[in-house]
Amino acid sequence: MDLIDAMGGQVFHLGPGQEVINILDFSQLLSELEQIPDDITRGDAPRREAIDAMKRRRATLVTGLLELGRDARISEKERSMVVEGLRILDEEFDIEKEGRQPRISDLVALVRSRHPRLAAIAQDRGDEERYAERAELLLDGLIALTSSGVYGSIFDGDSTVQIEAGRPVVFDLSSIDDGDLTLQAAVQAVSWSFGSAVVDAEKYLADAALRPRRHYFLVMDELWRMLRASSAMVFFVDALTRLNRARGIAQAMITHTMDDLKLSSDELTTIAWGFVARSAMVFIGGLAQSEMGNLEQVFAMSAREKSMIMDWSADGSLNPHTGTQAVPPGRGKFLLKIGKKPGTPFEVELTAAEMDVNNTNRAWTTAAERFRANAARVTETLEEAA
């Protein structure tokens, strides 16, 4: 966060009582993509492709959040109802009359209304009670995303987040309680989705010569939080990263150990491990033997490489005389693996300016400084008394 701020970027604080992201509001991107001109040979196909891509991302986000809340995959019927419901809102929601973009609560109202196109997907056979039964689970999940649900107004209001293309952006989730993994995962999913959508839209606009071509890099940190909140989120992450990969968007997925990718079934674990196997480059910090997962199989790691990584995982030794702890042996050290080629070990050395804006241990550092200052005063008092 300090780094992005120092670079003149945007910092959005997400959590209860803070910024709002309307998860249905892709209007800024869609209005820009509407400006893509007809192609000489393909007509309006480039414009339609770009707009359809944004709508697919929106649908992927909504269904992903539904699966997070349910901790299981939703049915194909429910997925189809979500996609068709979003399509109906695009066609029928009167933005000028309402004075705002459609929200998730509007999708709830639409599903409740038993719109004929949704009734057809639900196969209610003209029976209102059957429709209510067929749509009940879907409505339960959608209501949870509204201001009446567990997330409050974070996703169901007018967006206060407007990402400016060309500037660094970070989403700050620090206000969310560490124990609320579901809320953390939901906000992660939304921030990753919107960040990816902005970059994707910029690439479409650059293809149409409406933007200078820029190279973006998406950082998806704390992957373990999302997967721990619900194993079903592995499908959301898989879909999102595949979309990004297909569009040539550079992305980094960061987690602590390969154990974070061991999920509730072999099928889900295989999908999660695939994130690593498909990565062009993997940067490995210190790991214990038990934390390596399938790294040995995927990257054919030598005994020397494994030994080096395990050595890096050790804690810094404590000086019994001064009470200070030595720098951990693995601080700043990584092994770069590209396929099955021998890895390249390297050490990151930060400049003074970089050290300050990358200090993620600031709270502990401040506490330690206070402790040392208090200890010094106590020692001085005891010496004076003696």
Question: Where are the language model's segments positioned?
Answer:
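Extended, compositionally biased alpha-helical segments that mediate assembly or anchoring
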Residues: 329-341, 346-351, 358-386
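Short, exposed beta-strand "edge-strand" segments with a Pro/Gly-rich flavor and a Y/T-containing core
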Residues: 18, 86, 92-109, 167-169, ...
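Surface-exposed polar/charged interaction patches
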Residues: 92, 113-114, 148, 312-315, ...
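Short helix/loop capping segments that flank catalytic or ligand/cofactor-binding pockets
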Residues: 179-181, 228, 293, 344-347, ...
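Conserved ATP-driven motor cores of ASCE-family P-loop NTPases powering translocation/secretion/packaging/pilus
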Residues: 15-40, 233-347
